[in-house]
């Protein structure tokens, strides 16, 4: 504070009140990978509406699934999508086709397929519409797991094997993806009514649900806009078989339209059974990582631990008040631990700071715990 003022007048002095509150990161930016006859290849293009997509890649006649998926995304509430055209050249076999989607890492700016999305930080949802090959779906799941804050929306095959819905198998176990069935009938201005994979619709519904209700709410019981029908009609008995397997159904109800009727991940871990729980933790973990990067320039001592605990607690308190966490009190909804126990001498000597966070996303006082560490390089590391 100034010790003296040399003349009469109004003086303004800015006072540092400490670090800024943690900001909630976005959750609804999607990335689409598909084959298209026109447009840039392996160069992610940001589209914020259908017109921007057609300007870069043309309309429905230029791709089998990609255009319809992006259109369904915007029609169902999506607002931002990065589109990666992996090229329309025919592959010799399934392995060759999968390789196009998996991509190659030739360095920044020259990566292809899924690798090209590693250059973009803001992607939250990853879709490869119509790609039901296990190798491609495994690659999409691995990408989301490695990038940590992304979630895969996967399609079941268009046609099920003889024997009924109990023959449907889901992808490999992962808490970073969800699987949807059946395919959706839509209108194509060049072909009439056609069947399209559900992933593009679901990515848009995720975005709509995030904006209207919050990422902590399950993206279920939502109308599928643009759907004229379904490849298969699912009965309650059939859904009772599919739901425990992590296969989310889209169903048609009398007088209620076509709706999403499931919100499970493909994980066998009960803690990560639901799509909204996984995506809520993605948002929280990324928000905390981004909002605590300043700590790498501060002395790693009890004063710092107290500031970090205060900032993260304030952020989680806002989420609790919004209904994202369960509990009659903040103590039942979350806890933050950053002290000498999480930061012993060997951690401090390594230039790291570790915070333990527990949240109750389903039941009060039943915490799902993760630890986040800030490193000298400025990067964060999360373990669950």
Model-derived regions, located:
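Structured, hydrophobic secondary-structure cores that serve as assembly/anchoring elements
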Residues: 1-91, 112-384
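Short linear interaction motifs
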Residues: 96-116, 121
């Amino acid at each position: 504070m100034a010790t003296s003022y040399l003349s009469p007048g109004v003086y303004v002095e800015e006072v540092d009140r400490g670090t800024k509150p943690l900001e909630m990161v976005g959750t609804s930016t999607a990335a689409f990978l598909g084959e298209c006859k026109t447009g840039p290849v392996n160069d992610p293009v940001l589209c914020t509406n259908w017109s921007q997509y057609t300007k870069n890649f043309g309309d429905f006649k230029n791709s089998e699934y990609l255009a319809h998926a992006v259109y369904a995304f915007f029609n169902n509430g999506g607002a931002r999508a990065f589109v990666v055209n992996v090229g329309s050249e025919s592959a010799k076999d399934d392995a060759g086709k999968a390789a196009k989607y998996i991509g190659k890492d030739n360095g920044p700016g020259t990566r292809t397929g899924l690798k090209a999305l590693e250059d973009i930080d803001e992607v939250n949802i990853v879709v490869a519409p119509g790609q039901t090959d296990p190798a491609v779906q495994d690659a999409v799941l691995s990408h989301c797991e490695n990038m940590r804050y992304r979630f895969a929306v996967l399609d079941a095959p268009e046609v099920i094997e003889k024997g009924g819905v109990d023959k449907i198998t889901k992808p490999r176990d992962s808490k970073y993806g969800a699987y949807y069935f059946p395919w959706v009938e839509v209108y194509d201005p060049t072909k009439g009514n056609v069947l399209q994979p559900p992933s593009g619709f679901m990515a848009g519904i995720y975005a709509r649900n995030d904006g209207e209700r919050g990422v902590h709410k399950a993206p279920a019981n939502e109308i599928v806009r643009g759907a004229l029908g379904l490849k298969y009609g699912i009965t309650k008995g059939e859904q009772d078989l599919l739901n425990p397997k992590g296969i989310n159904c889209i169903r048609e109800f009398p007088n209620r339209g076509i709706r999403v009727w499931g919100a499970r991940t493909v994980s066998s871990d009960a803690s990560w059974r639901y799509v909204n729980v996984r995506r809520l933790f993605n948002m929280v973990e990324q928000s905390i990582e981004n909002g605590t990067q300043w700590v790498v320039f501060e002395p790693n001592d009890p004063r710092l631990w107290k500031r970090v605990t205060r900032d993260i607690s304030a952020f989680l308190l806002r989420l609790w008040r919004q209904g994202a966490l369960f509990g009659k009190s903040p103590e039942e909804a979350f806890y933050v631990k950053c002290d000498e126990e999480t930061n012993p001498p060997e951690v401090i000597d390594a230039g790291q700071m570790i915070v333990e966070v527990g949240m109750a996303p389903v039941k009060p006082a039943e915490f799902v715990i993760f630890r986040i560490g800030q490193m000298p390089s400025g990067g964060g590391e999360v373990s669950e």
